[in-house]
Amino acid sequence: PALQLQRKQRKDGTWGGKVHAADQRKLEPCLENALLALFNYGWNRETKPVKAAAKTLRTFLTQKKDLKFFEFQKAVKADERRERYYRWFLRIVALGLLIRAGYLDDRSRMAVLELLDRTAGFVDNPVARSPVEEIGASHPLIRPAAWRDGYPFIPDVYLVRIFAYSPWLLDGELAKMRLKKVFDYIMSPTYQELAPDLGLVRTAKGSFVKGHGLRIRPLEYYQKHGHLDELLVLFGLLSQLGLINRYPLLMSHFEWLHSQQNRDGRWNLPTKLLSEGSRWTSLLRIEKDWRSPARKEADMTFRMLLLFKNQWERQVRMLDRRDDGYPI
């Protein structure tokens, strides 16, 4: 599968001429999805397709006036506010992918700290208690006070990805304090009521949903409706920061996942709990498909062991907790 992906990469470093995974429900050709898949296969910054993609992603970290917006090119034309918004958005998407690929230097560290400061600043702002306003029967609109320098830094999956793959943040007390503050807000009723849409962005060309909020549902919802694949992807990020055992709701989910381990030490979650054709399931899957029960079991066991390993190692640093909060 990795070699097939490599062959489909375009000369501009993208797949399909797109950067961002717009549809969260299915795996479409784009730079973001392709890189995440390659990372799963063990490809890193030393490989040719990752290098080509990184070259494109680095352009979003600059202040170039003639920046190429790819799939957003038409959207930003003659719309200054939308251009500022997508400059920030693509910068955030790009930084997360570059860090995940192993591109870490002083410049990227400063960019991570800046985004953490801006996100924590939003959470500290009184507007965070009511970041949207009703404008009729449609989605609520993000309030002007929630914006800063052309972007609403409401925590979302892309900001969380940046923090999750920056474990060096756990070496600083100020950074840890800000991370806890951000995730306390994510787990709050105010945020959860807004997620995953997070409100409307209004510009000269109309409005669009910001999206990408982290929605954590009750365990009964996943058991009844499925979508456990989405929860596992979110847990993959949260475990990188060792924050799962800070929240009773997340720990109840985590303990239930642990209870699904078979007597032989493996996991094979029921297919009905996973959205078989979803983007999230595709990103969880390392094998080419799950037609074989053995392939699915191997993938799920690997994912679960990784969750437990990351959570245990990182919680010691994040929460200064030496005791194991759950049995392994």
Task: Name each region found by the language model.
Residues 1-328:
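Preference for long, amphipathic alpha-helical scaffolds in soluble/luminal domains
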